[in-house]
């Protein structure tokens, strides 16, 4: 098995920097032939590094291939540990971002901070309105900034969505200068109005929550909406804001309905894009007959998309429209049993994991524990396989359900990692079966268990060099509220079916679905008890 070419990466000298924009990663991960893999894996190295979005890039691979200072030897060193902890106002559900030497962290009290990556000093802070009081178990005592923002390196701007309570609950899209925290001229933009496919059924901020991570694509910011912990009547939405004109567009997962659900939450995972005008989402449960797609081909989408993976296209006027979809053939049962497909965020596998017949793959997993391997160019519709089964590239499992999104490692032949709810960290090995089809097979699990809503994995490595990778994740703790959370680090390749935990570090009280950020030999984690914590070697 040949190896994946990583994105443009840092040189191996300590603290050297490289560019890792999400846009570059759309095309920067390609599989090398064996002969090429034996040579240099790293192209010319630009000047600096960033971690601009949830799971590092728009494919949502969560693979940071530019981390020679986070290798096994470095992490096992006696001086690797907590470097600093900075107190912030409010719980941190969003993954921190790294913009140059500044870590940007946002909280549920609508506070945003720029923090020095070196020593944890607060460089700037902003308050973006009063959070909305919430009595739900998901976000009590209030809802502010829940989703992971996105950083546009070209303009030095951080885009984020805040829910605030001035003159009633509403969502605002903010554009902040990453260097100072100042709001850009003409911002914020209020999310309001009717979806393009559901006129007369306006967006309702009162019953909506914005958890899915933001996507920056071709000069627009896109983000999804689901329910506030399943309370009230709601439908899913995808919104987009043009960063130049500030024009807003809305699309509903349930045309003509205000109550048939299909929320876009994905346990905080980000909307996926593999190129211009292509956006992938996963949706949650539907409410009643007709909320999930009926039997039919994916390229003839209808108007109802609960329990589905949907590929949206961006029209010339900036509006969104469904172009393809996949929904399991038992989607009505999933709806009934609260086993939504959209508890998992999708991840697009880098070019090279596929074959000539299926060159562009996507991984999707949900609450019922099945892992679907899909073709991004032909998602499969509903019931289009033999005898009305699923027309997918492959299915693995079922294992325990997943509330999270995958991590990908392109070395050692290729692996995908999942954290099971009340289960284990699971490694799935990529291969091609005897019929020439791509497949994922379970290769091993961790001996340690994970509680409800533990975070999603992140992989660091030095290119695709074998022995350089580690898998990082947040364990949700021993208590119902995230007490005694840990940052755990695992070797990426199972030995005799077991993934070895290399080290763990206490975090205090952590949030659901927490994802660490990595950059330049450091790991950054936000916590429920209001801290941003950095780990690395003493320097």
Regions found by a protein language model. Give the residues of each.
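A beta-strand-loop signature enriched in Asp, Gly, Thr, and Trp
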Residues: 426-460
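Mobile, glycine-rich extracellular loop/lid and propeptide segments
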Residues: 50-352, 360-381, 400-428, 454-461, ...
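Inter-blade linker and blade-boundary elements of WD-repeat/beta-propeller domains
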Residues: 383-401, 439-447, 501-504
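Cytoplasmic membrane-interface segments at the C-terminal ends of transmembrane helices
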Residues: 11-15, 442-444, 489
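Secretory targeting and sorting signals
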Residues: 2-49
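Short, charged low-complexity linker/loop segments at the C-terminal edge of domains
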Residues: 435, 538-539
């Amino acid at each position: 098995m040949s190896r994946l070419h990583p994105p443009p990466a840092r040189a191996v000298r300590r603290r050297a920097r490289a560019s890792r924009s999400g846009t570059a990663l759309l095309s920067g991960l390609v599989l090398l032939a064996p002969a090429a893999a034996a040579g240099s894996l790293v192209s010319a190295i630009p000047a600096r590094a960033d971690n601009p979005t949830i799971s590092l890039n728009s494919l949502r691979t969560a693979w940071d291939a530019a981390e020679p200072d986070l290798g096994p030897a470095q992490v096992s060193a006696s001086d690797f540990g907590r470097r600093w902890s900075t107190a912030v106002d409010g719980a941190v559900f969003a993954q921190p971002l790294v913009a140059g030497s500044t870590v940007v962290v946002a909280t549920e009290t609508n506070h945003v901070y720029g923090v020095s990556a070196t020593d944890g000093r607060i460089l700037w802070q902003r308050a973006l309105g009063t959070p909305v009081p919430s009595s739900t178990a998901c976000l009590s005592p209030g809802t502010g900034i829940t989703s992971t923002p996105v950083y546009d390196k070209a303009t030095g701007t951080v885009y984020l969505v805040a829910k605030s309570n001035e003159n009633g609950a509403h969502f605002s899209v903010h554009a902040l200068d990453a260097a100072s925290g100042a709001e850009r001229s003409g911002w914020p933009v209020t999310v309001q109005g009717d979806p393009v496919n559901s006129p007369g059924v306006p967006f309702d901020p009162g019953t909506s929550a914005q958890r899915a991570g933001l996507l920056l694509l071709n000069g627009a910011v896109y983000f999804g909406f689901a329910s506030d912990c399943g309370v009230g009547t709601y439908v899913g939405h995808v919104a987009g804001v043009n960063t130049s004109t500030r024009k807003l567009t809305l699309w509903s997962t349930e045309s003509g309905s205000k109550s048939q659900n299909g929320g876009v939450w994905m346990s905080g995972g980000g909307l996926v894009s593999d190129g211009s005008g292509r956006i992938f989402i996963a949706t949650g449960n539907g409410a009643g007959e007709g909320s999930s797609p009926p039997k039919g081909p994916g390229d003839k989408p209808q108007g109802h998309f609960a329990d589905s993976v949907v590929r949206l296209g961006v029209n010339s006027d900036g509006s969104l429209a469904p172009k393809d979809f996949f929904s399991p053939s038992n989607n009505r049962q999933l709806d009934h049993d609260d086993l939504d497909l959209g508890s998992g965020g999708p991840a697009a596998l880098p070019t090279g994991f596929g074959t000539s017949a299926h060159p562009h793959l996507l991984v999707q997993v949900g609450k019922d524990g099945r892992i679907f391997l899909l073709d991004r160019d032909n998602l499969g519709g509903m019931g289009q396989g033999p005898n009305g089964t699923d027309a997918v590239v492959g299915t693995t499992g079922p294992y325990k359900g997943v509330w999270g999104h995958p991590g990908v490692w392109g070395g050692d032949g290729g692996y995908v990692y999942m954290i099971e709810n009340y289960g284990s960290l699971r490694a799935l090995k990529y291969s091609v079966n005897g019929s020439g089809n791509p497949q994922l097979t379970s290769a091993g699990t961790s001996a340690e268990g994970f509680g409800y809503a533990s975070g999603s994995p992140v992989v660091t490595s030095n290119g695709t060099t074998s022995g350089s990778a580690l898998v990082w994740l947040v364990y949700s703790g021993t208590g119902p509220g995230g007490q005694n959370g840990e940052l755990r680090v695992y070797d990426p390749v199972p030995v005799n079916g077991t993934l070895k935990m290399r080290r763990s570090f206490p975090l205090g009280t952590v949030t659901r679905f927490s994802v660490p950020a990595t950059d330049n030999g450091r790991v950054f984690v936000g916590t429920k008890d209001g801290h941003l914590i950095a780990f690395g070697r003493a320097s």
